[in-house]
Amino acid sequence: MTTFYTVVSWLVILGYWLLIAGVTLRILMKRRAVPSAMAWLLIIYILPLVGIIAYLSFGELHLGKRRAERARAMWPSTAKWLNDLKSCKHIFAEENSSVASSLFKLCERRQGIAGVKGNQLQLLTTSEDVMQALIRDIQLARHNIEMVFYIWQPGGMADQVAESLMAASRRGIHCRLMLDSAGSVAFFRSPWAGMMRNAGIEVVEALKVNLLRVFLRRMDLRQHRKMIMIDNYIAYTGSMNMVDPRFFKQDSGVGQWIDLMARMEGPVATAMGIVYSCDWEIETGKRILPPPPDANIMPFEQESGHTIHTIASGPGFPEDLIHQALLTAAYSAREYLIMTTPYFVPSDDLLHAICTAAQRGVDVSIIMPRKNDSVLVGWASRAFFTELLAAGVKIYQFEGGLLHTKSVLVDGELSLVGTVNLDMRSLWLNFEITLVIDDAGFGGDLAAVQDDYISRSRLLDASLWVKRPLWQRITERLFYFFSPLL
């Protein structure tokens, strides 16, 4: 019996170390950033069992077998659709401004189509303005409405949007609604999901959270897009979830969320429609390719229209493109670069690009909330401040609530607006969307919004920052080490 237990003990020990060695080898064989690999290895060696379970659950990008098969199957028809779209030559821009040229070329070569022109844009800076405009558009819809959100939180004006959507469905408008399972858990636990389905709306719970399948699909891969398409010619996107900030997370101690959305009319709605089509097919298996732009209903104004590229990220989409776009934007800056983000945990490459821009004389400003709803990200963000300040970057800490806007403005002409936070999760993992806009008029509108944010912010004083307590520095460095995993 003693011999039996001895053999079993040695087999357990051998299996334990073989498991650690196997996971270590897998991490080393994967082509990932060195800081990320080192962080995972540290966790595995300090807390082996916890680290191994965490890595198998969250360390690699698993979309799930069924979704991965759908993603592969959809691309032949999607590629044909994109090729057919190229025949609509009147919607594509032939040239761009000097500051936007490199980024638009990158997007065209990675995605296969050029930026689309002739779009009309309107910036909406309050949730009330967004929802009022949306309700009007829903009431005037004639054919179809598609929506996707990370969070839909019942209450306040969000309920008015829901009522208008159900009314549209009852009068014959084809309505589709896709919501992330984790972000919209309150919605799916409320009566609203059933009420909408009873009204004829197709409601899809995207990327369902199922702990029994934790090793088969990465649970923290989320559908983070916020998009609305109406009749294939009106579109919305930006940072706002379908929530009324007067009722959303009021106990978090950060104040109301401050967001920005863009309302668009024009062929950009078609470009966003193909993104939605891909998401819908990956999740449901149903193909809903949008029709090509209709020149009879879309004003392709070459002089006053805005030129836009739509960048989508996530499994099945061009890898690393949003990250490349941000790097290209930073390196294209000649006069000034302004960024707004709620969560700032950049890659080493992006941090280097931002600091280099400041060091070569570009006026670089980053606006982020003073109080953050994520303690982990809040501390990790602070770990980058010293390097940013040393390079000459201005850091503005917004004090008027939780600034949730995600925007970049380069030299007053090149703008990026969408759902992407400047953190690893948005850059490498989630389903995200960003608009790249080449237009000085829109740039002026965005600059006015960013100036308003700055007027409600406090400029971080470098001389005071270096005097912060030692315990804060230690905490910052601790979270900095694990920042590749946040």
UniProtKB/Swiss-Prot annotation:
Residue ranges crossing the lipid bilayer per the database entry: 3-23, 38-58
Alphabetized UniProt keyword annotations: Cell inner membrane, Cell membrane, Lipid biosynthesis, Lipid metabolism, Membrane, Phospholipid biosynthesis, Phospholipid metabolism, Repeat, Transferase, Transmembrane, Transmembrane helix
Entry GO MF terms: cardiolipin synthase activity
Compartment(s) of residence: Cell inner membrane
Membrane topology per record: Multi-pass membrane protein
GO cellular component: plasma membrane
Active site: 224, 226, 231, 404, 406, 411
Primary location recorded for the protein, binned into one broad class: membrane
Entries under Gene3D superfamilies matching the protein: Endonuclease Chain A
PROSITE patterns per UniProt: PLD
Catalysis: reaction(s): 2 a 1,2-diacyl-sn-glycero-3-phospho-(1'-sn-glycerol) = a cardiolipin + glycerol
Assigned EC number: 2.7.8.-
Residues covered by the PLD phosphodiesterase domain: 219-246, 399-426
Highest taxon, organism lineage: Bacteria
Keyword Transferase set for record: yes
Enzyme class of the recorded protein, top EC level: transferase
GO biological process: cardiolipin biosynthetic process
PANTHER family: CARDIOLIPIN SYNTHASE, PHOSPHOLIPASE D
Function, as annotated: Catalyzes the reversible phosphatidyl group transfer from one phosphatidylglycerol molecule to another to form cardiolipin (CL) (diphosphatidylglycerol) and glycerol.
Family: Belongs to the phospholipase D family. Cardiolipin synthase subfamily. ClsA sub-subfamily.
Name of this protein: Cardiolipin synthase A
Species of the source: Enterobacter sp. (strain 638)
This protein's encoding gene: clsA
